[in-house]
Amino acid sequence: MKVLIVGSGGREHAIAWSVSKSPKVNKIYCAPGNAGIAEYAECVSIGAMEFEKLADFAKENQVDLTIIGMDDPLVGGIVDEFESRGLRVFGPRKNAAILEGSKAFSKDLMKKYNIPTAAYENFDDPEKALAYLRTEARFPIVLKADGLALGKGVLICKDLQEAEDGVREIMEDKKFGNAGNTMVIEEFMTGREVSVLSFVDGKTIKTMTSAQDHKRALDGDQGLNTGGMGTFSPSPFYTKEVDEFCQKYLYQPTVDAMAAEGREFKGIIFF
């Protein structure tokens, strides 16, 4: 079978490497790809956000399956475009990809369906956000740009001055572009951060092994957050007890909540 991978980063490199090991696959394309991916796939000079061109390419080259690696095209509706053309594609539709594309949506969903999450407030007015920080916030506190920001749109602020500066950076200076039109102000939580990726078919969820991500730019857990400086798997902190709690209160309830909202999720959910 022929496979097309959409993206140009380390994630897509890992997907290409894995797909190349399948005896069922005889041809791999990647758009746009990169020099490392070229070891496993034929790189195609079509941008990840050029949905019509990508779908045309898949049709013309009789691609059997397209795998979307990047968040931006998923949130933009690439799966909808491919499905409308009768093409097989792996990833959530636009109305489900909002789970990753909008932190405010995700927080509201969890609140509505009683899925455990940190206390929060959403703001689309910087003055109201500043007023909240000055009157109700407890520090340290977390500021999150609502939209996609390559994993960098989260600021942990230790005092009011840092938080005020953060609001202005995100909402007024548009440090993260339109991702900062809305902002989530969230309770700061202590503890170990563990990530779990999961396969979802709209109803059933199958989790992968856990992973522990290191987001800070500098050694010693210092500096700003990034999309990830490194990771290891499995995490020793993801115990059987933690897994049982998450399976019961987080994973399946999230899938069920999305279905109840008419946003059936098919693809990979990142917890």
Residue spans of the language-model regions?
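A conserved helix-loop-beta module that forms one wall/lid of the active-site cleft
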Residues: 90-153
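ATP-binding N-terminal substructure of ATP-dependent carboxylate-amine bond-forming enzymes
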Residues: 1-94
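General beta-strand structural signal in soluble alpha/beta enzymes
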Residues: 5, 30-31, 67-68, 89-92, ...
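Internal nucleotide-binding/catalytic subdomain
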Residues: 153-271
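Short, charged, surface-exposed secondary-structure boundary motifs
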Residues: 38-41, 55, 98-104, 218-220
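Short acidic-hydrophobic, aromatic-tinged amphipathic segments that line or gate anion-handling sites
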Residues: 43-49, 121-125, 157
